[in-house]
């Protein structure tokens, strides 16, 4: 893959492998939504995924209170961090000498959480130079840059050695790639017995085809949401054997219903809520072992 020099913190940025990758890089380089940044400001963990769990209405208090919006933002952030913790619960036994990979790492919040939890190295890949620079700057602020690193990289063609990674994950980033290509790459760099975990939204084959709500989500994020069936088929074709599948749809709906009442709405909340309610869209965790 060809590279080009830049003057940013990231010394060399691989050129996009396809025009679509260039589109996605531009999308996330320009993204600065308050719903991501203001939530991250709560405790310095900047996420690019959604939340799970019951809303703590006692912590929110009275909507008429002048501090209510601040409390709502903190509650949304708590639910997003709970989602990341739930993903990490499924990574298996991880030692301090291991290396993990976050494929589609965003601004790096989950990477920081993984290092704090396991004491290991965490490598993140993203198409966005601005995200990588943000994540690396945050790691330096926390003085964990020797253990947590983001890089601009095509997640379908990573620099990691074959069999060198103990566990890896995609957290809401699989809808930007071909699943067979993605799982072939995870299978390549994971050690035998290594763990792969994804949390993702997928359209429900029982609905028949992607609903109008799913189509709206695709258009909003410039992505291509896959069906649940496609995940399982592509994993099986690439020596990743699923052993845990958790339907998180009921657990994420309260997050969306709360977010829809905040000042941070982006206009896509209704599509998520309606598609979860009508069964056309599902939010799932899948954990698989490399064999």
From Swiss-Prot:
UniProt keyword list: Magnesium, Methyltransferase, S-adenosyl-L-methionine, Transferase
Biological processes annotated in GO: methylation; terpene metabolic process
Cofactor: Mg(2+)
The reaction(s) this protein catalyses: (2E)-geranyl diphosphate + S-adenosyl-L-methionine = (E)-2-methylgeranyl diphosphate + S-adenosyl-L-homocysteine + H(+)
Cross-referenced InterPro entries: Erg6_SMT_methyltransf, GPPMT_Stmyces, SAM-dependent_MTases_sf
Broadest EC class assigned to this enzyme: transferase
Gene Ontology molecular functions: C-methyltransferase activity; magnesium ion binding; S-adenosyl-L-methionine binding; S-adenosylmethionine-dependent methyltransferase activity
One Pfam family per UniProt: CMAS
Enzyme Commission no: 2.1.1.255
NCBIfam families: GPPMT_Stmyces (NF041943)
Function comment: Catalyzes the SAM-dependent methylation of geranyl diphosphate (GPP) to yield (E)-2-methylgeranyl diphosphate (2-MeGPP).
Family assignment from sequence similarity: Belongs to the geranyl diphosphate 2-C-methyltransferase family.
Protein name stated in the entry: Geranyl diphosphate 2-C-methyltransferase
The species this protein was found in: Streptomyces ambofaciens (strain ATCC 23877 / 3486 / DSM 40053 / JCM 4204 / NBRC 12836 / NRRL B-2516)
Lineage, opening ranks: Bacteria, Bacillati, Actinomycetota, Actinomycetes, Kitasatosporales
